[in-house]
């Protein structure tokens, strides 16, 4: 757009001064985006991984986060319902980081908890967003603190070790999902 003088034309139409823009930072960022010198593999462990657009904001944030590090981000899509103790090493053994995004309902949560445990035990960087952060707390309570049935009240109202509770202002709010969401 700069080559087409769009900014200059717009400024003239609006009777504004149009100083010459300094695009050096922009050009540097575009160069970094187009010419990364490394690849970082991130496992995105969720329950909606068949629908990549469900996580579009997370994907774009990862891509943009790679730019200043001169890195391209390779996302390994992991269905949390399919992740289990028999395949966790094979599925997550080749990643540089694990991200568990938000979600709703109980479906796939045990796979997310397993991913959080794998990250902790193997010293792999982990980022939990919303439900992803909650499952990391559940994992820690179960496997480090020894509260074997630790859970979120939202997901298991009968747990004897509730490590995630509903906020008081959420009490009585109808759930917008079912347990298999």
Q: Which positions does each model-derived feature cover?
A:
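Conserved small/polar residues in nucleotide/adenosyl-binding loops
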Residues: 177-181
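Generic recognition of cysteine residues
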Residues: 11-13, 18, 130, 145, ...
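Flexible gly/pro-rich beta->alpha loop and the following alpha-helix that scaffold active-site loops
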Residues: 59, 63-133, 138-151, 155
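C-terminal lobe/tail of nucleotide-utilizing enzymes
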Residues: 1-60, 65, 70-90, 164-170
